[in-house]
Amino acid sequence: MSDDEEPPLKKNKLPVEEPTLIPSLPEELILSILARVSRLSYRSLSLVCKRFHSLLTSGEIYRFRSLSGYTENCLYVCLRFSHTGRSHRWFMLREKNKSSGYVLAPIPISHSPSLHASSIVAVGSKIYKIGGVMDGSSVSILDCWSHRWLEAPSMQMERDRPSANLIDGKIYVTGGCHRGSYNPSKWMEVFDLKTETWEPVLCRSDRLTFESYHERTNNLLVDGKLYIFWADKGVVYNPKDDTWDSLEVPEMDMCLTLFYCCVIENVLYDFFYEELDIKWYDTKARTWRSLLNGMRELHKFVRHASVTLADYGGKMVMFWDKFVASGDGLGFHKTMMWCAMIALERSDSGEIWGKVEWFGPVLPNQIPLEYAFEYVGSVKV
């Protein structure tokens, strides 16, 4: 096992209680000190003594961090290793222990439901899993404090491959409705995080037809509006005034690469394979613009690779794969996962520059050829 992998805590033997490093400090003061330490160091700190272990494995430390404003962004990644969706593993991106750079460290999460054909949304320190092939109305929550799954109120409709997004404390879900029904008032529904209730949202766009009602949709949140795409059509929904506008998909040229884009600080980014370029969408000019200097160092690495972009606390994280040849030289048998950390900066002229701060392999062990990203996103813990 690599030094950067994190085995379950139950496999680690806690040291015999010895004279405490800070013997007489009250618990609240210890919590205040530990809350200022990066969450990524908690697993190591929990081995120092039993008292640290007790505090760092309880929910109290995270409640203290949240109330005191010491939360930080942690990037969670879920990879699926089969077409059935039954074999998937969770990882967290963190800095290496003994060298510079990053690694995807495995997270021990038991009884994890299949995420295949579901929509995943991060809300604070929680990750919502919505819909799916089996029990399509179900909603589950991964508590990133305890890494335990909880159940949430079910949706009103069963949905297979829906799309969801968070807007002003509410989760909006569209599409994926089961065939054999058509009801524009149920194509979209919204979950209020405060009241924990689901309500339907009537779609008033003439773009919604019987055929598109069952299509898989993709949602993007830009400028407080929900951009919803399916097939070759799209609509824009503004929840503030409950208005719907039509959108031509060719206008944004997103038919093929929609699944690999991300929104960072209200700007939409996408990777264009033919040009091996990262671009951002200028909503005022309604055109794509290149991320200046963003891909210069990475061109030779991402050619013929599968690329995924994600927001990581205002920076862009780019994952891509690299095939590993078999020993006999007759093809490939494994893949390696690589990652780049890209800082973003907007100039006075309105252009956006990208600076590659680091790139390298992030999984110490190779992964199967057949894999897919089920989820990549930041949570606050």
From Swiss-Prot:
Residues 19-65 form the F-box domain. InterPro entries: F-box-like_dom_sf, F-box/kelch-repeat_ARATH, F-box_dom, Kelch-typ_b-propeller. Pfam families: F-box, Kelch_FKB95. PROSITE patterns: FBOX. The keyword Repeat applies. The keyword Protein biosynthesis does not apply. Keywords: Kelch repeat, Repeat. Kelch repeats lie at residues 126-169, 171-218, 220-266, 269-314. This is Putative F-box/kelch-repeat protein At1g60570.
